[in-house]
Amino acid sequence: MFLSSYENKIDKKGRVSVPATFRSHINSMGYNGFITYPSFNHSALEACSQDRIEKLSNTIDSLNPFEEKRDFFATSILSESENLQFDTEGRVSFSEKLLKHAMIKTNVLFVGLGKTFQIWDPKNFDKFKIVARKKAYQNRSNLKWENKQKGELS
C-alpha cells in the first residue's frame, strides 16, 4: 500500500526522488515506474500502477463506445497519462505539462492513498488537508468497517 506523505526537491535536471517505500511497493508489483495523470478534483496528479490504469481503461471501455462520456473519460485520463520510469537512483522526471497542472515549482509531495497516490505542491496540499480533515470528520459515520475476519482487532 501507499501510505504516508513524503516531500522531495526537484533537482536542476528536473528529476525527483520517489520515496523508497513507494518504489518498493511498485517494484513488488513487477514494475519499475508508475502511471500519472492530471487529477479531475485538484491541482494535483493522480498516480497508480500499470494494473490500476488498465482496470480504469477497462471500465472506460465498458461504456457505450458511441457515448460522449466514454470519449470524455478516455481523453481526460488515458490521453493525459504518462508512464514514468525510475532511473538507477529511483528518480523520475515529470513533464512540464504535468508540473503546470499541479502548480509544482521546486518541491513535490507524494501523498499515499492506499492503492494509489497523489503528487502535490506541498503548500497546496496543506490547504487541501485542512478541508479534507474537516469533511472527513463531518462524514465519519459513512466509513463502515467490513465484517471482521478471524484474528483481526476491532
Region locations from a protein language model:
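Flexible "stalk/tail and boundary" regions
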Residues: 1-7, 12-15, 21-84, 88-89, ...
